[in-house]
């Protein structure tokens, strides 16, 4: 009988998170160490998670004893843009549970983070992974690793049957599946199989722990929170995206050059993404809206600025599977470089399992609301309708109503 898909402890170390949480955390340490934030959990499909509160709380409390060991620190020290002062801070870092509020409110699971951005930032990914795995092991207690592995090999067979050797040689795929994974063991098995047997080009994982354990590249730059926080970090709202990109450039000096475009909308982003940023950043990440239409806007923007799109890369990460990735790849091949970050469809695609649709998003920074409008109406998020309306007005974004 194959190994169980579950381990008793869900999050084993500080590196069991997405790489961009560390890159943003360094940016926060150096630029906004005093910023205060609030985050709220949302289950987008209304699933009743109340029965799992006790187990979630138990796993949450175990985060408090996690530390960085010498081997993990040595791995991070080999990453040139992670600075010594940040690594010293990380060596001392502990999860502080006083910033986490969890319980039942309005007949549903309630989870809020409130505290210094620097100390709250690492909670998001492990908390989502805990909620996902606790729910999955209650619904599917006898799941074995072999079922996830077999499903992945079926996908490889499909890809070999539908893509040419030339296409496979260029098709770049990464694991972006930490936060909504079936379990930590399943994600590790998926990453190992991708590393060893993926028929295309497996380029890395967003999970820092797996990058360390499996000797693969950690991937990620920035998330929505980086741009959202800048809505309340000093500049005028109209200048907030520019401030976020400019701060990133000053922090990383041309490294980690993939910018996220849909915090407001792609059109609003391109209005701020001038020749300076377009030359400095290596490319853009898509996370909402129709991907090929979005890519056409990016290509046209680069061409208008006199930049050859083949010197830039588009990273796609919005609810992808291998089938959709191949379609996008074919639509854009030879016009701009592309790469695909696949999450839930790699780490929680098992026959009979419905993946969760859960998010934990920043709602406030320094006591004032922040918002994500995005290129997809369902992904708009803000606790303050007036602030969303004001932001739409400032950035000339029409209402999706």
Curated annotation (Swiss-Prot):
Top-rank taxon, per record? Bacteria
**GO biological process per UniProt:** NAD biosynthetic process via the salvage pathway
- Any one cellular-component term (Gene Ontology): cytosol
Q: Where does this protein act, in terms of pathway? A: Cofactor biosynthesis; NAD(+) biosynthesis; nicotinate D-ribonucleotide from nicotinate: step 1/1
- Alphabetized Gene3D superfamilies for the sequence: nicotinate phosphoribosyltransferase
Which Pfam families does the annotation name?
A: NAPRTase (PF04095), NAPRTase_N (PF17767)
Q: Which UniProt keywords are listed?
A: Ligase, Phosphoprotein, Pyridine nucleotide biosynthesis
- Assigned EC number: 6.3.4.21
Single GO molecular-function term?
nicotinate phosphoribosyltransferase activity
Q: Does the keyword Ligase apply?
A: yes
What's the top EC group for this one?
ligase
CDD domains named in the record: PncB_like
Which residues get modified to Phosphohistidine? 224
Q: What does the record say about PTM?
A: Transiently phosphorylated on a His residue during the reaction cycle. Phosphorylation strongly increases the affinity for substrates and increases the rate of nicotinate D-ribonucleotide production. Dephosphorylation regenerates the low-affinity form of the enzyme, leading to product release.
**Reactions listed under catalytic activity:** nicotinate + 5-phospho-alpha-D-ribose 1-diphosphate + ATP + H2O = nicotinate beta-D-ribonucleotide + ADP + phosphate + diphosphate
Question: What NCBIfam families does the database record attribute to this sequence?
Answer: NAPRTase, PRK05321.1
Recorded family membership: Belongs to the NAPRTase family.
Q: What does this protein do?
A: Catalyzes the synthesis of beta-nicotinate D-ribonucleotide from nicotinate and 5-phospho-D-ribose 1-phosphate at the expense of ATP.
What is the protein name given in its UniProt record?
A: Nicotinate phosphoribosyltransferase
Could you tell me which species this protein originates from? Pseudomonas putida (strain ATCC 47054 / DSM 6125 / CFBP 8728 / NCIMB 11950 / KT2440)
Q: Which gene encodes it?
A: pncB
């Amino acid at each position: 009988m194959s190994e169980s898909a579950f381990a008793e402890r869900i999050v084993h170390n500080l590196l069991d998170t997405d790489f961009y949480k560390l890159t943003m955390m360094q940016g926060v340490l150096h630029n906004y160490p005093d910023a205060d934030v609030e985050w709220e959990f949302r289950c987008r499909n209304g699933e009743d998670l109340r029965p799992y509160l006790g187990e979630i709380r138990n796993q949450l409390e175990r985060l408090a004893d996690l530390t960085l060991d010498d081997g993990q620190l040595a791995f991070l020290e080999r990453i040139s843009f992670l600075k010594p002062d940040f690594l010293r801070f990380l060596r001392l870092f502990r999860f502080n549970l006083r910033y986490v509020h969890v319980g039942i409110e309005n007949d549903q699971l309630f989870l809020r983070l409130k505290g210094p951005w620097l100390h709250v930032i690492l909670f998001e990914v492990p908390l989502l992974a805990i909620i996902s795995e606790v729910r999955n092991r209650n619904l599917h207690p006898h799941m074995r690793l072999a079922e996830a592995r077999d499903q992945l090999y079926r996908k490889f067979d499909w890809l070999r049957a539908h893509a040419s050797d030339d296409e496979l040689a260029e098709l770049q795929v990464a694991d972006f599946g930490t936060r909504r994974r079936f379990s930590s063991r399943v994600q590790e098995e998926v990453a190992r199989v991708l590393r060893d047997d993926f028929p295309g080009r497996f380029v890395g994982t967003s999970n820092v722990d797996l990058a360390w354990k499996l000797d693969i590249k950690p991937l990620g730059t920035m998330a929505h929170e980086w741009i959202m926080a800048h809505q309340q970090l000093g500049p005028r709202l109209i200048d907030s995206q520019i401030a976020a990109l400019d701060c990133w450039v000053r922090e990383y000096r041309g490294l980690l050059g993939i910018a996220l475009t849909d915090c407001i909308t792609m059109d609003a982003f391109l209005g701020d993404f001038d020749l300076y940023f377009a030359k400095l950043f290596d490319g853009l990440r898509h996370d909402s809206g129709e991907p090929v239409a979005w890519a056409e806007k990016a290509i046209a923007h680069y061409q208008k600025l006199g930049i050859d799109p083949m010197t830039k890369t588009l990273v796609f990460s919005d609810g992808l599977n291998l089938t959709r990735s191949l379609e996008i790849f074919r639509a854009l091949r030879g016009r701009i470089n592309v790469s695909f970050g696949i999450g839930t469809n790699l780490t929680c695609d098992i026959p009979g399992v419905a993946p969760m649709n859960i998010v934990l998003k920043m709602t406030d920074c320094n006591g004032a609301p922040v918002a994500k409008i995005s290129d997809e109406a369902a992904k708009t998020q803000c606790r303050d309708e007036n602030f969303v309306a004001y932001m739409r007005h400032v950035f000339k974004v029409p209402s999706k109503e």
